[in-house]
Amino acid sequence: MKLEKLIIENFRGYQGRTEIVLDDLTALIGRNDVGKTTVLDALGVFFGHKLCKYDVSDKCVYSEDNDDVKIGCVFSGVPENLVIDATSETTLNDEYLLNEDGLLELHKIFKKGKGAGAIHAYCNHPSARDAKGILLKKNDELKAIAERLSIEVEDRRSNVILRQAIYREKGELRLTPQYISLAKEDGKTIWEQIQTYLPHFALFRADRPSTDEESEVQDPMKAAVVNALNEIETDLNEIKVKVKEKALAVATNTITHLNDI
């Protein structure tokens, strides 16, 4: 996925909502203490960088006590399919988790500026009765809704199939922009899948020396190696089988000759 926009709200010096559009190359230019480092730290907090830890003191001092701190990222190039369980696949579009522009907009929200932050999708999501919030419902709850609406499905064990059947039956879903938590049930599973597609965030600090032993350098290389190995996993398994067959053939032949002797 590609990062298209950063959204900061009530984080340090950024009171209210601030949007920063990101191109292939983006430079932040400004005088000292204008908030350039805050932008990079906000990205670090969202992506969970070890050098960027959120603290309650990071909440904007001009915000209200009940105001939330939000750090959002908007992505294009979302995955075509997501695997929910061994038998079910879905898409972000089918789950109504994309915003009005058809992009994936994720926010790490710190309620009242406290806590570890929870991931929410800001999306055009159903608000109609029986269709609202069903991404976060358990299988038994989905089956109860399906029974109430007299819906028959081929596999009642699949939350994906149940949700899509409910959406189709309701018809008018009353889509409205809203925050949907990705902290539990299939929402959590979808977030776990999304994380494998997130861009890698590396932070190089100019005030300290950088070496090829640092995680900013090694982590992308390790990820590239893992991806390459995954792509040729089938070939490697075939090689492993052939090596095993050859070794067993030699061993069997040797034992046969020893028995003859």
Q: Can you annotate each of these PLM segments?
A:
Residues 100, 104-112, 124-148:
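Extended, regular secondary-structure scaffolds
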Residues 26, 75-79, 110-114:
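Beta-strand elements of well-folded, non-transmembrane domains
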Residues 73-87, 153-185:
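Extended, Lys/Arg-enriched charged tracts that mediate electrostatic binding to polyanionic substrates
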Residues 40-102:
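Conserved P-loop NTP-binding catalytic core
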Residues 24, 73-77, 205-208:
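Flexible glycine-/small-residue-rich
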